[in-house]
Amino acid sequence: MVMKASVDDDDSGWELSMPEKMEKSNTNWVDITQDFEEACRELKLGELLHDKLFGLFEAMSAIEMMDPKMDAGMIGNQVNRKVLNFEQAIKDGTIKIKDLTLPELIGIMDTCFCCLITWLEGHSLAQTVFTCLYIHNPDFIEDPAMKAFALGILKICDIAREKVNKAAVFEEEDFQSMTYGFKMANSVTDLRVTGMLKDVEDDMQRRVKSTRSRQGEERDPEVELEHQQCLAVFSRVKFTRVLLTVLIAFTKKETSAVAEAQKLMVQAADLLSAIHNSLHHGIQAQNDTTKGDHPIMMGFEPLVNQRLLPPTFPRYAKIIKREEMVSYFARLIDRIKTVCEVVNLTNLHCILDFFCEFSEQSPCVLSRSLLQTTFLVDNKKVFGTHLMQDMVKDALRSFVSPPVLSPKCYLYNNHQAKDCIDSFVTHCVRPFCSLIQIHGHNRARQRDKLGHILEEFATLQDEAEKVDAALHTMLLKQEPQRQHLACLGTWVLYHNLRIMIQYLLSGFELELYSMHEYYYIYWYLSEFLYAWLMSTLSRADGSQMAEERIMEEQQKGRSSKKTKKKKKVRPLSREITMSQAYQNMCAGMFKTMVAFDMDGKVRKPKFELDSEQVRYEHRFAPFNSVMTPPPVHYLQFKEMSDLNKYSPPPQSPELYVAASKHFQQAKMILENIPNPDHEVNRILKVAKPNFVVMKLLAGGHKKESKVPPEFDFSAHKYFPVVKLV
């Protein structure tokens, strides 16, 4: 049957069955069964009619339509209740718009918070926040507390959505920004909403004070209960106001707004214990006739927006539990506090490290977006005050001290040299901003994007080498004792190597590699990337020292006083040390995997449609766009890692001994680092047990066993603890 013409589209009856709908509506229905069958007779057996208006998409939709498993709209036919929108519920008397009791307010507010969090975790507004009917149109609400709260939630959603859209570090699995045509309280200003919340807060505070117990007075249980409930509503309203004010603060361009947000976050954190302790005071879901996880209580209707969803939308959004809501908010507050700390950093390298460390915690999309918009404000300046070009120049000075950026150098005031370096620095801005933005994406997407940005850095590397050569030629004419070789090139190469290392290591975190692939990933890291990184860091350190010597000689010429030489801590020494530790860990894992393979402890797949070479080339494919360091192709790798070139070729016991030495070396390097951070301690938790296990294996422990070992990545994401089974 088809619907020929609609006379009256009645929304309220959409949950009725088909025959009931036909009886109830004024729609003119036409039976097309006979016409359809006659048309089909004209087709021969096996013949299909392909109309240009009926392609694969329409065919799939036809299969899905009205199938309860695939058509979200069919859910309405499976529930035993009438699905009402806000206006209908008010008429029906199933929802209160005034004189809400304190337990009702607490229950509705808590469920709204749960819906808000579920939305931030990637579900749609239609299935989360807008299942609360009060949010649909706060103008209808007469209860001041409920009205202010509903407007507050709408404003929080609106600003959060704007922030996430502006930062553009989300993918479809992270965040749904569609508002489905709902009004986001745009007719009311942010200031008015915070004012309304403050009025309710003050009113509740008065009630809290008036019901407080007095010394020597016998306590009435009812008054005590009212006191607890008033305190619960007060805490929730204040928390909403503080959270909204924090998001408003992040929309300001001034850095002082971040300090304001920091103070407010402390206030928000203090309210969480009161919210947690009063969860039981709120009304709970009365019944659950939808077979889903969504609580059904006054003011909520999980199916109210079902018609707004695409036909094959997931049936239910699993709304988080109230107990989890408080701990989620606690973590969100901690993340926002961390975001506020970024404005204290001045060096581009430190900012980049901050973004990497923040990303490692897999933060939510809102905190990732706030970090991005705090770093690069609307005016395209870092923190709204610094030019990105100046940040790049400072990073160059602190890393390689290029003569062209030294005020005492001839090139500093040379117009041609100035144009060269300024042009190069301007070209650096886009790739570095993109790199920082990549660290705002979720971990899985980051890896893919790191592979692509290598192309931009390869182009930058090429330009850096050309600029270095041009500046070196200019410098030799005026100051022959100075060099400008590989200064800018060293700096870009350093970032190139960091991206390549991060790309490979993230594969362990995302569990992309099979056990039989570990050996060539760890080989590439230890023998190639970390070796290049350490020589790059040493070259940068050498450039710094050469520039410092020239500066000291110039100072000596001017001052006749003898200055006491203090032992200076080299700026890159810690990074060089950490790279040595990482290289030893990778070398240890490579030799461990080769030895396990010799002992038959590594299960390899029977390659049919691919081979080890195909897998190897796929793993390192993004590196083909990079000229320096040149990519190591599979045949080169096999040749370089071939043990038969040694005489005699080492056997598994020797390899276990060699691996144990690498783990021991990493352990010694890390134990000598002053003020070890979390990363140092995490690697030590792997290096120590692996050293012991390698010693056991070298001594012949479980030599005959062919059971594959276990690799436990719980202590560190990139280096597993080897466990013998």
Swiss-Prot record:
GO cellular component: cytoplasm; cytosol; NatC complex; nucleoplasm; plasma membrane
Principal localisation: cytoplasm
Annotated keywords: Cytoplasm, Phosphoprotein
Localization (cell): Cytoplasm
Signal peptide: none
Gene Ontology biological-process annotations: negative regulation of apoptotic process; smooth muscle cell proliferation
Residue ranges, annotated region (Disordered): 548-573
List of residues that carry Phosphoserine: 187
Functional summary from the UniProt entry: Auxillary component of the N-terminal acetyltransferase C (NatC) complex which catalyzes acetylation of N-terminal methionine residues. N-terminal acetylation protects proteins from ubiquitination and degradation by the N-end rule pathway. Involved in regulation of apoptosis and proliferation of smooth muscle cells.
Quaternary context: Component of the N-terminal acetyltransferase C (NatC) complex, which is composed of NAA35, NAA38 and NAA30.
PANTHER family recorded: GLUCOSE REPRESSIBLE PROTEIN MAK10, N-ALPHA-ACETYLTRANSFERASE 35, NATC AUXILIARY SUBUNIT
Similarity-based family: Belongs to the MAK10 family.
Protein name: N-alpha-acetyltransferase 35, NatC auxiliary subunit
Natural source organism: Macaca fascicularis
